[in-house]
Amino acid sequence: RERRAPMPLAEGRVRCRTPLGARDGIAARNLLGAILNEGGLARDAIGRIQVRDSFSLVELPEDGLERLLGKLKDTRVGGKQLKLRRYRED
């Protein structure tokens, strides 16, 4: 399957990755709800959410990212740990 180039990021946002994806029964709304509820962000602070088969990508504000990831450290979605990390494209 052909790899798609990621969409360009809006200024001030970074892409984060979770190992949860469609195979885990995860939908974008599940990730959105968890990040809004546990992270305390406003809806407009969260950018594009891309759910792939075996992982998902979420665009989040770069400012305060480490604090946000700390808040989400123990968050579970669909009974599985979110494990959200900053995504570095190689």
Segment roles from a protein language model:
Residues 3-90:
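Terminal-proximal interaction/regulatory segments of ATP-powered molecular machines
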